[in-house]
Amino acid sequence: MNLSNYYWYFKSALRPKFCDEVIKYALSKREKFALTGGVGRQRDLNNKPLSRKEEEGVKQKRNSSIVWLDEGWIYKEIQPYVHEANERAGWNFNWERTENVQFTKYKLNQYYDWHCDSCDNPYKNGMIRKLSMTCQLTDGSEYEGGELEFDFRNYDPHMRDESQHLNKAKEILPKGSIIVFPSHVWHRVKPVRKGVRYSLVAWHNGYPFK
């Protein structure tokens, strides 16, 4: 699917106080080792811990800590921006619900390699991920590395080089910035070289495209 806009952003959209409150609240919770879909994102590691091979497999793709949040005051802040981006970017995807929000902590050398958030196999409720959102909780001056990068992949590989289809989302470095994008768009978080990067991620689900 070729798109006119592969993401839509809102610079410094959320108040710094809100960002600080989310960080404080999330850090008061017990964080978890971030998983990938291959081993089950909702897997209970207390009852079914990863084998050494599984852990190594996850870390080839992803290395970070997360906290799941299901708080109305957070949804109230972020959802209007998702609706606005969906309309202004021209996607006009029909979506019904937001999954639990993921607070993510990237420390030194932590990352999330290339992936997309959606697949054609619906959840049990019959829905798929349609729109993804990331909120920058820490200012870009507070850490180094950790760039959110997109691969639009709308190119003929024999005609174009990598520099023409990779895009670093520098627009969202200021604290409180929000970026929304279709969940099938490939993206990654590059390794953090200094400091800690905190972000808030949410997925907005709807019934499969027809």
Language model regions located:
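Fe(II)/2-oxoglutarate oxygenase catalytic core
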Residues: 1-180, 184-210
